């Protein structure tokens, strides 16, 4: 009875097909790495904007570049992405007969390799940028930055109205595919795998042995390059491989650390939280008025530090506590991603409008 239930749970179409729990776990792995790294970079940028502000402003591009190196390394060396290899899975080209399947260390054919790179690296980057664009447009629409009769405003309002339905259809497509995978009606838990022309399978004993012996064989079979171009190409390959290997090692350690943190915080009980929140409130910082005579600050407290006029639509920056006109600080933060006075990294969502009794 238990065996029958296990077979229903895995819903295997083929013998090496992983269970839904394995494929969902590997999907959630990289989606947890991005926000974790983003939080680390944000903390560093807030503590030292001069040195780490660049990494915060260009986080998406830097992360995508590192992700490209990492996924390229794993797809060419193990026929799997980093998260798939972490859970002992590999990508199998659709249409291959079971007897003719390639070992994992052979890598993917060029067509499937390029499609996999596109769906693993490029598509998530575009999705993140689209979500940020939608968030920015909603901010502008909420505070009416553009004139009501603007053609551009009518266009992006229509875009904002349609986006939730498009996003719901996209997520529903993935949900339906996962349900079909659970019921054994599909070999792919994700539509992107089908578009890439591959499916996921477990690593076999032969795959593991080939992956373990490949580094030793590669080091023994290295031949001296003939021309200068070949030497440069070989050096670049070694450099990229070294960076990818360092990233994979660091990510493996980081993943275990993230899992430890999840366990640590999930094990906290309510008594511990209450004891921490019951501690007395610390005194205010003594350095808040240190820069009160800064030339950037006007002497009149009702004057905006940017336009040097009486403030209109008072807005405070959550990152620094200074108050500006909404329009002034909105355009400044959107252009510079920093507080005009302190230089702290700041985003549009850090703007808080104030409503005084006089208004």
Swiss-Prot record:
Q: Zinc fingers (RING-type) span which residues?
A: 304-343
Mention one GO molecular function.
ubiquitin-protein transferase activity
Q: Which Pfam families match?
A: Pex2_Pex12
Q: Mainly resides where?
A: membrane
**Segments crossing the lipid bilayer:** 20-47, 52-76, 110-139, 145-183, 250-277
Q: Which residues hold Zn(2+)?
A: 304, 307, 325, 328
Q: Which residues lie on this side of the membrane: Peroxisomal matrix?
A: 1-19, 77-109, 184-249
Q: What GO terms describe the biological role, i.e. biological process, of this protein?
A: cellular response to reactive oxygen species; peroxisome organization; protein import into peroxisome matrix; protein import into peroxisome matrix, receptor recycling; protein monoubiquitination; protein polyubiquitination
Q: Which UniProt keywords apply?
A: Membrane, Metal-binding, Peroxisome, Protein transport, Transmembrane, Transmembrane helix, Transport, Ubl conjugation pathway, Zinc, Zinc-finger
Instruction: Provide the membrane topology annotation.
Output: Multi-pass membrane protein
Gene Ontology CC entries for this record: peroxisomal importomer complex; peroxisomal membrane
As for subcellular location, the record says: Peroxisome membrane
The organism's place on the tree of life at top rank: Eukaryota
List the Cytoplasmic topological domains: 48-51, 140-144, 278-359
Q: What is known of its domains?
A: The three subunits of the retrotranslocation channel (PEX2, PEX10 and PEX12) coassemble in the membrane into a channel with an open 10 Angstrom pore. The RING-type zinc-fingers that catalyze PEX5 receptor ubiquitination are positioned above the pore on the cytosolic side of the complex. The RING-type zinc-finger is degenerated and only coordinates one zinc ions, preventing E3 ubiquitin-protein ligase activity.
Quaternary state and interactors = Component of the PEX2-PEX10-PEX12 retrotranslocation channel, composed of PEX2, PEX10 and PEX12. Interacts with PEX19 via its cytoplasmic domain.
Can you tell me which family this protein belongs to? Belongs to the pex2/pex10/pex12 family.
Q: Any idea what job this protein has? A: Component of a retrotranslocation channel required for peroxisome organization by mediating export of the PEX5 receptor from peroxisomes to the cytosol, thereby promoting PEX5 recycling. The retrotranslocation channel is composed of PEX2, PEX10 and PEX12; each subunit contributing transmembrane segments that coassemble into an open channel that specifically allows the passage of PEX5 through the peroxisomal membrane. PEX12 also regulates PEX5 recycling by activating the E3 ubiquitin-protein ligase activity of PEX10.
| Protein name per UniProt | Peroxisome assembly protein 12
Task: Name the gene for this chain.
Answer: PEX12
């Amino acid at each position: 009875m238990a065996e029958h239930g296990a077979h229903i749970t895995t819903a295997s179409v083929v013998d090496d097909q992983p269970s839904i729990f394995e494929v969902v776990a590997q999907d959630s792995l990289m989606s947890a790495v991005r926000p974790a790294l983003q939080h680390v970079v944000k903390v560093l940028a807030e503590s030292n904007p001069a040195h780490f502000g660049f990494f915060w402003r260009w986080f998406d591009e830097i992360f995508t570049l590192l992700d490209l190196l990492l996924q390229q390394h794993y797809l060419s060396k193990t026929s799997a992405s980093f998260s798939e290899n972490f859970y002992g899975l590999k990508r199998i080209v659709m249409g291959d007969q079971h007897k003719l399947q390639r070992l994992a260390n052979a890598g993917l054919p060029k067509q499937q390799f390029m499609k996999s790179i596109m769906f693993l690296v490029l598509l998530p980057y575009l999705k993140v940028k689209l979500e940020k664009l939608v968030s920015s447009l909603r901010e502008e629409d909420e505070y009416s930055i553009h004139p009501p009769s603007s053609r551009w405003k009518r266009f992006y309002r229509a875009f904002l109205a349609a986006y939730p339905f498009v996003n719901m259809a996209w997520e529903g497509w993935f949900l339906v595919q996962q349900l079909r995978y659970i019921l054994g009606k599909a070999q792919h838990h994700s539509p992107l795998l089908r578009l890439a022309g591959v499916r996921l399978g477990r690593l076999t004993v032969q795959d593991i042995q080939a992956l373990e012996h490949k580094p030793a064989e590669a080091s023994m079979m290295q031949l001296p390059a003939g021309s200068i171009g070949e030497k440069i190409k070989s050096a670049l390959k070694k450099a990229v491989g070294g960076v990818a290997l360092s990233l994979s090692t660091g990510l493996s350690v980081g993943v275990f650390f993230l899992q430890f943190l999840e366990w640590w915080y999930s094990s906290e009980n309510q008594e511990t939280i209450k004891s921490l929140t019951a501690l007395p409130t610390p005194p205010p910082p003594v350095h808040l008025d240190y820069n009160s005579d800064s030339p950037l600050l006007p002497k009149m407290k009702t004057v905006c530090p940017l336009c040097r006029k009486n403030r209109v639509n008072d807005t405070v920056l959550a990152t620094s506590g200074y108050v500006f006109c909404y329009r002034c600080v909105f355009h400044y933060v959107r252009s510079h991603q920093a507080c005009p006075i302190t230089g702290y990294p700041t985003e549009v969502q850090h703007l808080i409008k104030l409503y005084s009794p006089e208004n």
